[in-house]
Amino acid sequence: EEFISWYHEFHQIPELGFEEKETTELICEKLTGMGIHPLRLDPTGVTAYVGPHDAYTVGLRADIDGLRVSEDTDLPFQSKHPGKMHACGHDGHITGLLGAASILKKMEAELTVRVKLIFQPSEENTKGAKQIISQGILEDVDEVFGLHLFSDIKAGEISVEPGARMAQTDRFTITFIGKGGHAAKPHQCVDATVMAADFVMNVQTIVARELDPIEGAGVTVGSLKSGTQYN
């Protein structure tokens, strides 16, 4: 129940990448309460150690940032930050790592390895990992473990398999340039909206016709903006 209450706390304070000030403070507060000394990263994020000082070091990593998504769930622990939400489960990742820290601290005398807790900022914009590496956070780590919540797996179960587990992403932005005019005279215009709509439909043929069907892939157009007037 304590871990669930932590999850509710973090769910209410989602913050975007490298803006996780409140999240960082709350993580430090929880670790300090366990008797674990937190080290703040720059500009956000936290690391800490549990176990013997001069020992083989295992890193446990969780990401801590939220998404620019509005939450409308009416949950009692709904996001308090308008336009931001923990929609990718990083609140659960934080809670899981804090839970592991709590358990490991209680059995610290039995540990034969040192555990480094790594609360990584800014995973969603793909810049946080490089940031903590540049600060030397992984220099004293021999191996690292992480996880990701997955809604298709039943609560209380885990899924482990060799090789790649989840897909990597690339982002694209495309600008279609047309020629403005009036809807009553489309023959005098170059309609960029039609161009964009045609692209959205036909870009799916990359997956359907250009790639090996045995390989997993997907193309998503997440946002399309066009025009300012209805006519």
What are the residue ranges of the model-derived segments?
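Acidic/His- and Gly-rich active-site-bordering loop/insert found
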Residues: 1-86, 91, 95, 99-111
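Histidine/acidic-residue-rich, glycine-tolerant segments that coordinate divalent metal ions
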Residues: 67, 75-85, 92, 109-230
